[in-house]
Amino acid sequence: MAMSKVSTGGRTILSLTALGHFINDGNMWIIPGIVFPILSQMNINYATIGILSSLYALISALASPLVPLTVRLTGGHMRAMGIGMLMWGLSIGVIALGFQMHLLYLVYAGVLLAGVAAAFYHPIGSAVLSSKYGGNAGLALGINGAFGSLGRSLYPLLASIAVFGVGVIYGFNLWVFALVACLIGIGVLIYSLRYFDVDPVRERRASAAYAKSLGVSIGLIALLTVITLLRNAVGQGIQTFIGIYLNKNLHISLSVNYGAMLALILSSAIIGQPLLGWLSDRVGRRLMASLSTFAFAAFFIAFIFTGSLVYAFFSFMFLLSNFPLIMAVVGDVVPRELVGWATSIVWNVAVTGGNVVGSLITGLLAQYYSATYGESLGLEHAMLVVVILAFVSGLLWVLVPKPPKRSKVPLFS
């Protein structure tokens, strides 16, 4: 991968990409952690919230081709990353304005714009670091991933302080996070224009060996896609409504205390990802991928029946820490020349499909059950029904063949 305006400022590049990851993953949790519970307080029903979350995921998927297009049009990856940060600033700003003006259509529009913003960072951040650090990118990628997990954990707390800390729900205070995203976006753009950027890359044509390997591996890739889609559907459905569940079912008022509890649950991935990576090196990729899926589902059911946040912590630890392990298994069982294509399929079809379907199914089921059991029990029933898919996903791992090679599991996604 070519580089232009190369500087020795590796630390600056790592700092900017890490801050970008922190902001991107943090903003992604403002939507289900802050915006959706506020909408629920405003008597927006589960079906509407589920559809809104599903459209957010769908738009994020449809916006994916905009990322390489933006890279080509601007002439660099970091410039595209800066534009993605500015998109986050715009989307969160529109949401804040919608709450201030009591215009729900602006809040909805902001959530959908956030879907576009969410498409940018992840395919760009690793490309920038891999280009700058080359074969020594492992540590940089790990630090970068840790900042993503940290942002995901801290933003619900920080946003709760801003929005709920004044004693009333004041959604307009989300403008602070819009401003931060814009400032970092501008900083990235200035740095990329003056010092360093990663040039666009031309894709290579597929070889005959590539086509032959594809024919042999297509069934396996399809199986891995189904496994991941089912698991991600459950995960997305639960993540969409977990904030509402804490508020309505566990009666945790929307306050700084609510944000602290949600942050604690989400922080589980900070220890979970290296722990699962370490365990998988000892007991095997497939087994750990299967067991972690069962563990996530079992702990979540225990959380539903007991209301204990300890069970929620461990459930989310296995939920949020499993994806790097799945990607490692894909890299192990698929021929080397197909790894990039296979991981792309798993990401774009399984993860995106799960995100779209999971929120939609959970929201519609919650709305359906609410007519019979009431709002609180309706949401509880919906989550218990959806989590069954996780057990199916866990069982399907027995059909995946033993990997012919063992690759190191990335500690942070």
Feature annotation, model-predicted:
Residues A63-G76, G272-G284, A366:
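Helix-to-loop junctions at the C-terminal end of transmembrane segments
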Residues L86-M101, F294-G307:
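C-terminal ends and interior cores of transmembrane alpha-helices
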Residues G135, I143-Y195:
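Helix-loop-helix hairpin linking two adjacent transmembrane segments in secondary transporters
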Residues R285-V329:
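C-terminal transmembrane helical hairpin of 12-TM major facilitator-type secondary transporters
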Residues R336-A371:
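A late C-terminal transmembrane helix in Major Facilitator Superfamily
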Residues I31-P32, L220-I270, G358:
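Extracytoplasmic gate region of multi-pass secondary transporters
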Residues G110-G148:
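Cytoplasmic helix-loop-helix junction between adjacent transmembrane helices
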Residues V163-V180, L364-A390:
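A membrane-interface helix-boundary motif in multi-pass transporters
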